[in-house]
Amino acid sequence: RCADPARPGAMGDRLRERIALITEHGGYPAEGFGFDLNGFAGAPGPRFGPNTECGATPQANPVTYPFTSYAGDVTFTQPNLGARAVDFNTEGMLHVGLLPELIEDARRDGVTDAELEPLFRSAEAYLRMWERAETRAAALRAR
């Protein structure tokens, strides 16, 4: 998830590749994602500070507050855990409530809203997949 200074938007490479594959195979261009809520060992780590996962690769465009949601209808301010301010940039994704920061981080890297759109269509994609499964099941039962 580290930014590549030579390639703005590089954080979106895997999403773009996945959507291209889905579309190429006739699927609805959407991508769901989830996190294992039993632990955050595999959660995205920090891009900045002493615990960075980016090694010596220089990073730019940290998440700053306030920022506006993808839909533009919510303004996010610095999150807190009790009295402690949480710094997504140096602590990474500590909890699922920092999902807006993860999306904003990709936007700051140059991933466009159009490229992020498939993340916000995942519920529709799930319903379409379910409908196809129901149709296929009915066809199999009719044999």
Regions found by a protein language model. Name each.
Residues R1-G26:
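Catalytic pocket-lining loop regions of alpha/beta-barrel enzymes
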Residues A3, E53-G55:
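Sequence contexts marking disulfide-bonded cysteines in secreted/extracellular proteins
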Residues L21-P29, R108-A114:
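Structural alpha-beta junctions
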Residues I22, G34, I103-A106:
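C-terminal regions of proteins
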Residues G26-G45:
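Short acidic/histidine-rich active-site segments
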Residues R47-T52:
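Short secondary-structure boundary/capping segments
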Residues N61-R143:
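Mid-to-C-terminal alpha-helical segments outside catalytic/metal-binding sites
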